[in-house]
Amino acid sequence: MSNRFAVILAAGKGTRMKSKLYKVLHPVCGKPMVQHVVDQVSQLGLQKLVTVVGHGAEKVQEQLGNVSEFALQAEQLGTAHAVDRAADILANEEGTTLVICGDTPLITAETMEALLKHHEEAGAKATVLTAYIEEPAGYGRIVRNENGHVEKIVEHKDANEVELTIKEINTGTYCFDNKALFASLSKVSNDNAQGEYYLPDVIEILKGEGHIVSAYQTEHFDETLGVNDRVALSQAEVIMKNRINHKNMVNGVTIIDPSNTYISADAIIGSDTVIHPGTIIEGKTVIGSDCEIGPHTVIRDSEIGDGTTIRQSTVHDSKIGTEVSVGPFAHIRPDSVIGNEVRVGNFVEIKKTVFGNGSKASHLSYIGDAQIGENVNLGCGSITVNYDGKNKFKTVIGDGVFIGCNSNLVAPVTVEDGAYVAAGSTITENVPSKALSIARARQVNKEDYVDQLLNKKKS
């Protein structure tokens, strides 16, 4: 196998997106389009990967980091001009170069690997990735000769009646002999209506020099979808969503309603987990086996242990242990660590808190900037008062603590192991171990007060 290189074209402005966001950074199933392409291309055993950037170059470089080298196309003068920007990095290399657009998020490593192998086995100087479609209007047609090699690529507007009947189309993805590619780029002319340098002209140049130009036809036309506007973006989203859901179901995950379930491409879900409708799983979330998620639940960049149930709730950037029950209508905010066999009930919000094994907050509580021990019971309406208008303060609750209903813990404060806090208390000082703390006004009953008040009003 020869050395392999790839050039990703990601310099276009994307005017038809009508967006402030650079086109290739628009997400599909939670991941930028160009990141999808890079993730797949990176599986091909490349020696070098070059991404050609233009508009929004800094943001694309920030997204991709050091997985790619970058070449700048400061002025967009066509696809051949874009590839030529990578000359300083690749022109002297021996091997095969894949050229692909950064707005094709559905392309898979398997299809690109098949294209590369076909190219190498055919002994071609260039190979075009093609597809067969029943309605090819608007696409460039592949005209083959009697040997099955590519004779030319004809744009729809330039095709004659015979060529218009061809249903094999150019997808815009190519393989080239690297040296032949960069030698040909210098020969491409911009003598056309747009005054731009087009990559398909390299095919004509190589063909004219007597080189073999081959074509590899993929069975998966959907993979070649280029996203140029919001309509195509939504189409890519649906296709990717279905692909991700199918993969999870094949791997043993039950998805009750795949059409109403949204799972990130980077999410990992264990077998025998059930996903209910309206669930959104984002980022690099990891969910264990035998879990029940949803309905109407959002989980982002979090780790969920085996056997955990999360209903009608939101979990962000947190870790939840095994056999935990969350919801309905709970909110686990970033930097929270929930232990095993924990109960986080309805209308409970937890933020930046370590919540120990076996502890419970079953209803109507806010727990923020806290450290909760094991086997703690937080009664209905328990609140950690963590903010004084300027700074956040920590609440520490030891093991086996019982907090009565409607209690306020004014941080910084510590309730030591085994202590009890009476219902309705506002705790402003530390509570010793095993102590009962009562911090509320003493009840006063005024006998016959109501009758006296009403008689007084009548008189």
UniProtKB/Swiss-Prot annotation:
Enzyme class: transferase
UniProt signal peptide: none
GO biological process terms held by the UniProt record: cell morphogenesis; cell wall organization; lipid A biosynthetic process; peptidoglycan biosynthetic process; regulation of cell shape; UDP-N-acetylglucosamine biosynthetic process
Pathway it works in: Nucleotide-sugar biosynthesis; UDP-N-acetyl-alpha-D-glucosamine biosynthesis; N-acetyl-alpha-D-glucosamine 1-phosphate from alpha-D-glucosamine 6-phosphate (route II): step 2/2; Nucleotide-sugar biosynthesis; UDP-N-acetyl-alpha-D-glucosamine biosynthesis; UDP-N-acetyl-alpha-D-glucosamine from N-acetyl-alpha-D-glucosamine 1-phosphate: step 1/1; Bacterial outer membrane biogenesis; LPS lipid A biosynthesis
EC number: 2.7.7.23, 2.3.1.157
Binding-site positions, acetyl-CoA: N386, Y387, A423, R440
Cofactor: Mg(2+)
UniProt region (Pyrophosphorylase), positions on chain: 1-230
UniProt-annotated stretches for the region Linker: 231-251
Function: Catalyzes the last two sequential reactions in the de novo biosynthetic pathway for UDP-N-acetylglucosamine (UDP-GlcNAc). The C-terminal domain catalyzes the transfer of acetyl group from acetyl coenzyme A to glucosamine-1-phosphate (GlcN-1-P) to produce N-acetylglucosamine-1-phosphate (GlcNAc-1-P), which is converted into UDP-GlcNAc by the transfer of uridine 5-monophosphate (from uridine 5-triphosphate), a reaction catalyzed by the N-terminal domain.
Quaternary organization: Homotrimer.
Recorded family membership: In the N-terminal section; belongs to the N-acetylglucosamine-1-phosphate uridyltransferase family. In the C-terminal section; belongs to the transferase hexapeptide repeat family.
NCBIfam families found in the cross-reference section: glmU (TIGR01173), PRK14354.1 (NF010934)
Name the UniProt record assigns to this protein: Bifunctional protein GlmU
Lineage: Bacteria, Bacillati, Bacillota, Bacilli, Bacillales
Gene name linked to the record: glmU
